[in-house]
């Protein structure tokens, strides 16, 4: 069996049986990481020595008969906007290039308590603002399927690392599609949970009412396992829901016969939707129908208003969140400034990249006294209407289905001079964040050029179990997940 296609449960069985040790497993993934990294640039920081030491400690604990967590010995990667105690957290920005957090984020703390082993921090668009992982201060990440193409963003490093086999699974964050779009582009599974299902404590904030942490993995079952570990209430995050955490893997094997799957009309009629993507997702919908699901066309009339709404709300929240970076307490500080005001202005001008500066300016404008009613408040009203459209749709269906992205991974640099084209790549994912719903991207095919295509399934609030059930049943029937970008990997 090709070990790059193995699931968390299969690795766990081999670790428990002694067929492979945690140290051997970590070494295998580090070897693959080191071989693929020159062509991918998926990592900002590789923690090889720390990973090997932790893996050896877990092997000793296993040999001593100690109880171990469900992820014991498994090599994991973390998006570099999640704080990791003692390990740099840069947000791929010059502003935080030397920042080493004195504390651990809730989600990473839960991963380490479950036995996970950190192999590195992954590259992202600066402060998670982008859709291609090209705005990183540490260089762009490439797509493992074709290194002339982008991996998506902003969690492109996390998606590329899983696709390349540099780790068993990874974490990302999703503000407008930043888990699902890279998952689609890189041919892996990516889940954005319900807003508040997973703690944001220790996630460096971009847009606080939209940000959500979620997992990438090679299969739906693996994503369910990771969600089981990171989900749940957190008193340190007031937006984290005090909701019971179900066993997400319990219903994976159940038939979807009789479930109603809604195909959102506005998504399949969207301007700019690649015909190959549309055909692949429609064929996947037909496969769900063959499994016993009932397909229903539904309408979300304000779905296409999501882009305009998002690009008022998200930059507005970003301009407030990023105001803390002033060159005083931490982060980059410009030298030889003639005054405090000049130091702050120069620190931001020198340390923030062009896209981050653009979004701060948009947000500051939208929140200014003369325009807050016309832009920000109106955007919040439209956001409510978008959520009501979803509420209406879920009265007649169990899950919703769309393409994840309008196209396959585009070529590196293709949208460098056209921010609007870059923003439109999130057309099909953004409304889900505005509504706070859970959604998953599952590989559903390939283009003629050999690039992955993703299908997005959207669930109702806190209905991740149903979402994962449908995704798993499709995945098992389609077997698309078994493919890997072999050309980008070492044997």
From Swiss-Prot:
Keywords noted in UniProt: ATP-binding, Ligase, Nucleotide-binding, Protein biosynthesis
Enzyme Commission number? 6.3.5.7
Record: active site: 79, 154, 178
InterPro entries, alphabetized: Amidase (IPR000120), Amidase_CS (IPR020556), Amidase_dom (IPR023631), AS_sf (IPR036928), GatA (IPR004412)
Q: One Pfam family from the UniProt entry? A: Amidase
A single MF term (Gene Ontology): glutaminyl-tRNA synthase (glutamine-hydrolyzing) activity
Reported function: Allows the formation of correctly charged Gln-tRNA(Gln) through the transamidation of misacylated Glu-tRNA(Gln) in organisms which lack glutaminyl-tRNA synthetase. The reaction takes place in the presence of glutamine and ATP through an activated gamma-phospho-Glu-tRNA(Gln).
Quaternary structure? Heterotrimer of A, B and C subunits.
Q: Which PANTHER family match?
A: GLUTAMYL-TRNA(GLN) AMIDOTRANSFERASE SUBUNIT A, TRANSAMIDASE
The protein in question is named Glutamyl-tRNA(Gln) amidotransferase subunit A
Organism placement in taxonomy: Bacteria, Bacillati, Cyanobacteriota, Cyanophyceae, Synechococcales
């Amino acid at each position: 069996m090709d070990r790059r296609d193995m699931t968390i449960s299969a690795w766990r069985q081999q670790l428990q049986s002694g067929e492979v040790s945690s140290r051997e497993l970590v070494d295998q993934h580090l070897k693959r990481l080191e071989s693929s990294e020159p062509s991918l640039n998926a990592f900002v920081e590789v923690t090889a020595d720390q990973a090997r030491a932790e893996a050896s400690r877990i092997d000793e604990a296993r040999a001593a008969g100690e109880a171990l967590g469900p992820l014991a010995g498994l090599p994991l990667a973390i998006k570099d906007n999640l704080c990791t105690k003692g390990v740099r957290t840069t947000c791929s920005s010059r502003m935080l290039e030397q920042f080493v957090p004195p504390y651990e984020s809730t989600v990473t703390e839960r991963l380490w308590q479950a036995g996970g082993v950190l192999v590195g921090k992954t590259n992202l668009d600066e402060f998670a603002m982008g859709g291609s992982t090209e705005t990183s201060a540490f260089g762009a990440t490439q797509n493992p399927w074709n290194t002339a193409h982008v991996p998506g963003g902003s969690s492109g490093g996390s998606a590329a690392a899983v696709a390349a086999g540099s780790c068993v699974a990874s974490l990302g964050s999703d503000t407008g599609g930043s888990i699902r779009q890279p998952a689609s582009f890189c041919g892996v599974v990516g889940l954005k949970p319900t807003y508040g299902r997973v703690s944001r404590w220790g996630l460096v904030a971009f847009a606080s009412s939209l940000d959500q942490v979620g997992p990438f993995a090679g299969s739906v079952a693996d994503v369910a396992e990771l969600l089981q570990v990171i989900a749940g209430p957190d008193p340190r995050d007031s937006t984290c829901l005090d909701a019971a955490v179900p066993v997400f893997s319990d219903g994976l094997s159940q038939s979807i016969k009789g479930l109603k799957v809604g195909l959102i009309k506005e998504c399949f009629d969207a301007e700019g939707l690649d015909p190959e993507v549309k055909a692949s997702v429609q064929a996947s919908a037909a496969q769900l129908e063959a499994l016993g699901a009932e397909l229903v066309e539904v309408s979300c009339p304000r779905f296409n208003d999501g882009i305009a709404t998002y690009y008022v709300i998200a930059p507005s929240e970003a301009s407030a969140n990023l105001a803390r970076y002033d060159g005083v307490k931490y982060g980059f500080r410009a030298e030889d400034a003639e005054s405090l005001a000049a130091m702050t202005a120069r620190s931001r001008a020198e340390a923030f990249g062009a896209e981050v500066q653009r979004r701060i300016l948009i947000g500051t404008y939208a929140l200014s006294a003369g325009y807050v009613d016309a832009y920000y408040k109106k955007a919040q009203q439209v956001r409510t209407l978008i959520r009501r459209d979803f509420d209406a749709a879920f009265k007649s269906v169990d899950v919703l289905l769309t393409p994840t992205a309008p196209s396959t991974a585009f070529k590196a640099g293709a949208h460098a001079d056209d921010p609007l084209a870059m923003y439109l790549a999130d057309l099909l994912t953004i409304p889900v964040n505005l509504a706070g719903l859970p959604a998953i991207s599952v590989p559903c095919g390939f283009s003629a050029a050999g690039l992955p295509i993703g299908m997005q399934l959207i669930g109702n609030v806190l209905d991740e179990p149903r979402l994962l059930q449908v995704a798993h049943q499709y995945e098992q029937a389609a077997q698309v997940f078994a493919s890997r970008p072999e050309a980008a990997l070492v044997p």
